[in-house]
Regions:
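Active-site gating loops and adjacent loop-to-helix segments of metal-dependent hydrolytic enzymes
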Residues: 66-91, 129-132, 147-149, 154-157, ...
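Histidine-rich, glycine-flanked metal-binding segment
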Residues: 7, 11-50, 67
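Solvent-exposed loop/turn segments at secondary-structure junctions
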Residues: 27-28, 48-49, 58-61, 115-117, ...
Length: 186
């Protein structure tokens, strides 16, 4: 039982001096002067309770920290357009960054490929829970996003190889071609 907190309830309401009862990791009641019962009590006077935060652009698990080559799988930089790769296949659930994010209140994370490619692949939305596999972290029913980057990263990565795109106009030309190819594929 968390007592005397300033609570933001996720609907825009602020509740001062509020109580929040949590059972088995889920909020089961909220209000003021809730009965304690057999619950452990935490005095949260001067502290805030908020819904879990959602990180909509993260590279946790695909660029693990501390970084070593074996866990740096965020960019498939073999072609400027790698729409067929999925970030979830590179997620390392033991990345210590997940625990750090959770300690800061981040409970849901969209993991995206890096920005080295024009079209870097599909992202995945995960629940930030301790797990041994990314499948155990997947957020049920979450939509997938497609990572696209238009700017410094693709033109730097490929320009340094004397390959297109090496300019922003090359970036946009690459998008046009990728979209035309996708239309033809349909």
């Amino acid at each position: 039982l968390i007592r005397n907190a300033t609570v933001l309830d996720g609907t825009g309401r602020r509740l001062d001096g509020a109580d929040v009862l949590i059972r088995d990791g889920k909020i089961v009641d909220g209000g003021t002067a809730l009965p304690q019962g057999d619950a452990t009590t935490i005095d949260a006077k001067g502290r805030w309770v908020t819904p879990g935060l959602i990180d909509v652009h993260s590279h946790l698990g695909v660029y693990a920290s501390p970084g070593v080559n074996a866990t740096q799988d965020g960019n498939e930089m073999t072609d400027p357009v790698t729409a067929g790769v999925w970030a979830e296949h590179s997620v390392w659930p033991q990345d210590p960054g997940f625990a750090t994010a959770l300690a800061g209140g981040v409970t849901t994370i969209q993991i995206l490929p890096g920005s080295g490619n024009l079209i870097g692949g599909r992202g995945v939305t995960l629940r930030n829970v301790p797990a041994t596999t990314y499948q155990a972290m997947k957020f049920p029913g979450a939509l997938q996003g497609l990572k696209m980057a238009c700017g410094e990263n693709p033109k730097r990565v490929y320009g340094e190889r004397n390959q297109a795109p090496s300019t922003r106009m090359g970036n946009v030309a690459g998008y046009r071609q990728a979209f035309a190819d996708a239309t033809d594929y349909q």
